[in-house]
């Protein structure tokens, strides 16, 4: 199997040997008791889980043990390599343009991929974007794009290559790439193991290493709406992923970005597609535009075409044209109306004042309750469900004015969604302190 280089020295003092016969209970017990899994144990458990010899409940137990006990960097490197080896690996080195990709660790209202991918393609790079579905309270790019009538994310490797040549970009389901991660990703979503740093790092990097891009920019979210709220943990995650990428010949860089408040004014699937179209048309919320342009600049720099101005591609319409071509190439119809939820309800201000902080986690959970996310793997999301934010932190609010509009096809969900929002915002006499959107940059 192709291996991720052991870029960190192994510490064998905590190795608990797994017998050569290998069985899931022994592997689980090893990690439960604080031991370090050997390379052979990791190779076996990933292969066995992929082909069904390790049951879902057994992998759930192992994931929980990893959440509580952690992994050292040698284990993370091997776990990542095993997931890469579980499926197909793409190679775009023969394309006439540089390849670069972006990955976000997940946030609330994070629709950045939608304008970013065509924007970077319009500036001359090829962007092979293997994306995922919603995870926990965070939205998924594929769920958003599939709210566009006719859009398909199921592309073969040959079709991805053809589309990169013709359009310069493709946004697709990982499919045969790292199938072990696809199974584990869905399992983590429903077993409260989303927040494990080793599992986040290996999940992201296994797909990205298998994807074959020459460069990668990571958007590591920090704050209440991120998969991990602690800035220290997010820094460790960013450094781990940058080192994994660089050790495997992928030029990798990370931005730490704020996710204490939702990005933009919408959280949901079709709602976020509509907002992404506003950005591509030269408008859109300032925070979405700022982060899109900054990530585009980083991607173009790593691709060796940093002299291109992504803001110009937004202004002159070339990014919008590239998005339309991308959607059409994947069967989507942007001329058809986006789905609209059957029911809406509004949260209004009880008093006047200034909008305080809006908690990203509260809004993300409200959207999830409304049907924008899924309670278990295989459940369909509601394309039109979600939350629209009418007042951003620091903006003036009048008594009785709408603050949020909630959308769903099933009105009995409103109560639970409003309960999630309750306490997640405030209106008071003083504007909240402002936070920088971009916290730090971590390079190779």
What is the role of each PLM region?
Residues 4, 8, 14-109, 122, ...:
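Acidic, glycine/proline-rich low-complexity segments that act as flexible tails and inter-domain linkers
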Residues 22, 26, 31, 36-39, ...:
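Well-ordered secondary-structure scaffolds
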Residues 63-66, 144, 181-190, 219-228, ...:
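Active-site-proximal beta-alpha loop/turn segments in soluble metabolic enzymes
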Residues 68-69, 115-128, 207-212, 247-248, ...:
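Alpha-helix C-terminal capping segments
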Residues 98-121, 125-138:
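Glycine/serine-rich anion-binding loops at beta->alpha junctions
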Residues 130, 164, 172-174, 219-223, ...:
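Short beta-strand segments
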Residues 144-170, 239-245, 249:
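A glycine-rich helix N-cap at a beta->alpha junction
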Residues 165-213:
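Phosphate/diphosphate-binding glycine-rich loops and adjacent basic-rich segments that engage nucleotide
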């Amino acid at each position: 199997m192709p291996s991720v280089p052991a870029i960190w020295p192994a510490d064998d003092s905590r190795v608990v040997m797994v017998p050569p016969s290998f069985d899931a209970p022994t592997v689980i017990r090893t990690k439960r008791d604080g031991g370090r899994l050997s390379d052979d144990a990791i190779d076996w458990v990933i292969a066995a889980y992929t082909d069904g010899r390790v049951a879902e409940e057994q992998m759930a137990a192992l994931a929980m043990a990893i959440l509580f006990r952690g992994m050292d960097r040698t284990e993370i490197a091997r776990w990542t390599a095993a997931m890469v080896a579980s499926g197909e690996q793409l190679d775009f080195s023969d394309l006439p343009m540089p390849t670069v990709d972006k990955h976000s660790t997940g946030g609330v209202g994070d629709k950045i991929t939608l304008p970013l991918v065509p924007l970077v393609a319009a500036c001359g790079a090829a962007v092979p974007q293997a994306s995922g579905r919603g995870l926990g309270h965070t939205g998924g790019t594929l769920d958003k794009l599939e709210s566009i009538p006719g859009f398909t994310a199921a592309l073969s490797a040959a079709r991805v290559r053809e589309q990169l040549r013709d359009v310069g970009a493709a946004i697709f389901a990982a499919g045969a790439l790292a199938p072990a991660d696809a199974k584990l990703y869905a399992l983590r979503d429903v077993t409260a193991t989303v927040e494990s740093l080793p599992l986040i790092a290996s999940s992201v990097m296994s797909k990205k290493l298998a994807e074959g891009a020459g460069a990668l920019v990571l958007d590591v979210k920090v704050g209440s709406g991120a998969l991990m709220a602690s800035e220290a943990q997010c820094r460790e995650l960013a450094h781990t992923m940058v080192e994994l990428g660089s050790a495997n010949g992928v030029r990798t860089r990370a931005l730490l970005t704020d996710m204490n408040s939702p990005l933009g004014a919408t959280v949901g699937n079709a709602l976020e597609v509509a907002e992404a179209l506003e950005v591509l048309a030269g408008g859109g919320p300032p925070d979405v535009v700022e982060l899109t342009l900054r990530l585009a600049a980083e991607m173009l720099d790593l691709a060796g075409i940093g002299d291109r101005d992504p803001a110009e591609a937004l202004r002159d319409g070339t990014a919008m044209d590239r998005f339309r071509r991308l959607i059409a190439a994947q069967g989507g119809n942007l001329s058809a109306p986006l789905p609209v939820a059957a029911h809406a309800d509004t949260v209004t201000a009880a008093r006047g004042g200034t909008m305080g902080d809006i908690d990203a986690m509260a809004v993300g959970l409200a959207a999830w309750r409304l049907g924008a996310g899924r309670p278990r793997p295989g459940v369909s999301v509601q394309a039109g469900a979600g939350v629209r934010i009418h007042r951003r932190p620091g903006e003036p609010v009048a008594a009785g004015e709408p603050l949020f509009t909630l959308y769903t096809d099933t009105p009995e969900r409103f109560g639970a969604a409003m309960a999630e929002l309750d306490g997640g915002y405030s209106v008071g006499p003083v504007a909240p302190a402002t936070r920088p959107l971009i916290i730090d940059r971590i390079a190779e």
